[in-house]
């Protein structure tokens, strides 16, 4: 028997958005739109008849806002939710609230040129729905079917930075930690960073997230943590007690000047279909930090970071992968484990200890 299609409920007050998203998703062989609603009140009437595998949800709607609806869903029947948000500061902040409330993915939409943008972003939407369908949301049963990845060709970290020549630079007194994550990473990073004391190694983090969202995300983590957390700026020095988060839409690399590590924030093509890319970050850490670094790959769909973690291991870094039981999506860690890139496989609640102790 063929695998069951992923059923999707769309909730958005824009008729244009609903029309385009229904067409895109229903044109995808493994996805079926079981309903579309103009607001959460209509959505609840549809949920009374049939429950989907995934909900695609706008956050700014009449009668009931998306956050209130999301919290209601998560309290009654936890379900993977993809947030469809505007590319505005308010949209970013509201979407981060949604991620904290249990949403697993964000896709963005502009304020103008909406129809063409959504059509151009069809692959991103489909990938987000597939990632959500394969996520483990709280006590949601895990799907047995593997996610269907986009077979289109993708660039590797070679497009940004050549691999290390075989000899990592000599160890310094400063140890650094590089972290890569995607789907489910916002909640996972919050759990890890808020568990750290003020005195800890400097960190560089790639979280797959749209442009304009990472600054708000960093501000939120900073307000919750004892350490300092902020969006990275070009040439920032990596310091103990500081976590630098790669800006959405940019790659972040580590470089070294004397005994000190800095970051470079650069433009460049998508790597593994992402910008920022975990592989780009990890490769730079392997090249410039080697034995003086720890690499940690956490929850997320796909394979971004798997090869980079192996390069870090080969350069002498300590390497860690999050275990399947604590992942929202066991994709990136799974691919790293397949490559024998992880020295240790540990649950989320132990990752802060891996940061503190090599």
UniProtKB/Swiss-Prot annotation:
The keyword Repressor does not apply. Its EC number is 3.1.1.61, 3.5.1.44. Signal peptide: none annotated. GO terms for molecular function: phosphorelay response regulator activity; protein-glutamate methylesterase activity; protein-glutamine glutaminase activity. Phosphorylated by CheA. Phosphorylation of the N-terminal regulatory domain activates the methylesterase activity. Pfam families: CheB_methylest, Response_reg. It comes from Pseudomonas syringae pv. syringae (strain B728a). Residues 170-358 form the CheB-type methylesterase domain. It is an enzyme of class 3 (hydrolase). Contains a C-terminal catalytic domain, and an N-terminal region which modulates catalytic activity. It is found in: Cytoplasm. The modification 4-aspartylphosphate is found at residue 58. PROSITE patterns: CHEB (PS50122), RESPONSE_REGULATORY (PS50110). Keywords: Chemotaxis, Cytoplasm, Hydrolase, Phosphoprotein. It comes from the Bacteria. The keyword Cytoplasm applies. The active site is at 182, 208, 304. GO terms for cellular component: cytoplasm. GO terms for biological process: chemotaxis. Involved in chemotaxis. Part of a chemotaxis signal transduction system that modulates chemotaxis in response to various stimuli. Catalyzes the demethylation of specific methylglutamate residues introduced into the chemoreceptors (methyl-accepting chemotaxis proteins or MCP) by CheR. Also mediates the irreversible deamidation of specific glutamine residues to glutamic acid. This is Protein-glutamate methylesterase/protein-glutamine glutaminase 1. Residues 7-124 form the Response regulatory domain. It catalyses: [protein]-L-glutamate 5-O-methyl ester + H2O = L-glutamyl-[protein] + methanol + H(+); L-glutaminyl-[protein] + H2O = L-glutamyl-[protein] + NH4(+). Belongs to the CheB family.
């Amino acid at each position: 028997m063929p695998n069951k299609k992923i059923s999707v409920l769309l909730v958005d007050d824009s008729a244009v958005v609903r029309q385009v998203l229904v067409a895109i998703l229903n044109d995808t062989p493994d996805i079926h739109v079981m309903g579309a609603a103009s607001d959460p009140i209509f959505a609840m009437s549809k949920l009374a008849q049939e429950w989907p595998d995934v909900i695609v949800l706008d956050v700014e709607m009449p009668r009931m806002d998306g956050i209130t609806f999301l919290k209601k869903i998560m309290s009654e029947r936890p379900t993977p939710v993809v947030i469809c948000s505007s590319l505005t500061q308010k949209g970013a902040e509201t979407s981060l609230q949604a991620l904290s409330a249990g949403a697993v993915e964000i896709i963005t939409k502009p304020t103008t040129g909406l129809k063409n943008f959504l059509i151009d972003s069809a692959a991103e939407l489909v990938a987000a729905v597939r990632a959500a369908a394969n996520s483990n949301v709280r006590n949601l049963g895990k799907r047995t079917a593997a996610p269907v990845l986009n077979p289109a060709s993708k660039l590797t970290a070679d497009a940004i930075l050549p691999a290390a020549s075989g000899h990592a630079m000599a160890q310094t007194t400063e140890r650094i930690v590089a972290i890569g994550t995607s789907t489910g990473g916002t909640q996972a990073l919050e759990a890890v960073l808020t568990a750290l004391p003020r005195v800890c190694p400097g960190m560089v983090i790639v979280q797959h997230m749209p442009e304009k969202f990472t600054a708000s995300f960093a501000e939120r983590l900073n307000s919750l943590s004892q350490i300092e957390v902020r969006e990275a700026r070009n040439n920032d020095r990596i310091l103990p007690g500081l976590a630098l988060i790669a800006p959405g839409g940019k790659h972040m690399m580590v470089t070294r000047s004397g005994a000190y590590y800095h970051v470079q924030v650069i433009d460049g093509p998508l790597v593994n279909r992402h910008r920022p890319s975990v592989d780009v970050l990890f490769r730079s850490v392997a090249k410039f930090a080697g034995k003086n670094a720890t690499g940690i790959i956490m929850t997320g769909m796909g394979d971004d970071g798997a090869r980079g973690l192996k390069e870090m291991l080969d350069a002498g870094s300590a390497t860690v992968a999050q275990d399947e039981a604590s992942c929202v999506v066991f994709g990136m860690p799974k691919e790293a484990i397949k490559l024998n890139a992880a020295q240790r496989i540990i649950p989320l609640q132990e990752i802060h200890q891996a940061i503190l102790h090599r």
